[in-house]
Every structure is written in structure tokens, then in C-alpha cells.
Amino acid sequence: MARIAGINIPDHKHTVIALTSIFGIGKTRSQAICAATEIAENVKISELSEEQIDKLRDEVAKFVVEGDLRREVTLSIKRLMDLGTYRGLRHRRGLPVRGQRTKTNARTRKGPRKPIKK
């Protein structure tokens, strides 16, 4: 297994799909990485040479991924909550943040129904 950005990349998958296992790299960005490193998208990771894997590592290192990205997102949400913004309050209460309706639906965000006590 190749190790890129601290993640074990699955050998049996094509390069584009395997790179998406890194947090912060989606399909579009993985296609751009393959184009920049001149590696075919349909080649499996196990078929790549060590030099090609090093090229992939160098290209992925240019982006904010994995732990740094997770920390950035967490700090951004914490900042909103500390400022007391509307979005921060919605995060704190565990409700939808982007204007979705909550009279019905939003069960994923709100959690299971709580029975009304009589």
C-alpha cells in the first residue's frame, strides 16, 4: 500500500478513485493531480512506480488535506460559535445551518424524536 499524506491508499483501485480516500481531495481535484503529474487516471496504484508515487505525494502536499483541513474546519465553526453569529448558534443547537425547514424534516440533524411528557 502506498502512503500519501499519512493515509494508506488502496492498491487495487484506479488512481483517481484511490486519491479520493484522502480527506480534502474529491474527484475533480484528484483528476487535476493526475493531469499535473502526467499519470493516467485508469492506472491502478499497484502498477505505479516509486517515482510516480513520489510525484503524487509532492502534488498532494500542495493542498490543505487531512488533519490540517479538519482542524481548519473545526476552528472555523468554533469561531462562528464564539462570535455568537446566527450560524454559530445553529451549530451549537445542533440544527440545520443553511436555512432548511425544521417544522418537518431535519431529523438527521435534530436526532431521534423525543416523546412529549404529559
From Swiss-Prot:
Record GO biological process: translation
GO cellular component, one term: cytosol
Keyword Zinc among record annotations: no
Chain residue ranges for the region called Disordered: 91-118
GO MF terms, alphabetically ordered: rRNA binding; structural constituent of ribosome; tRNA binding
Keyword Transport appears in the UniProt entry: no
Coiled coil: none
Extent of the signal sequence: none
Pfam families in the cross-refs: Ribosomal_S13
Keywords carried by this UniProt record: Ribonucleoprotein, Ribosomal protein, RNA-binding, rRNA-binding, tRNA-binding
Quaternary structure (record): Part of the 30S ribosomal subunit. Forms a loose heterodimer with protein S19. Forms two bridges to the 50S subunit in the 70S ribosome.
Function: Located at the top of the head of the 30S subunit, it contacts several helices of the 16S rRNA. In the 70S ribosome it contacts the 23S rRNA (bridge B1a) and protein L5 of the 50S subunit (bridge B1b), connecting the 2 subunits; these bridges are implicated in subunit movement. Contacts the tRNAs in the A and P-sites.
Entry similarity comment: Belongs to the universal ribosomal protein uS13 family.
Family annotation (NCBIfam families): uS13_bact
Protein name in the entry: Small ribosomal subunit protein uS13
Designated gene of the protein: rpsM
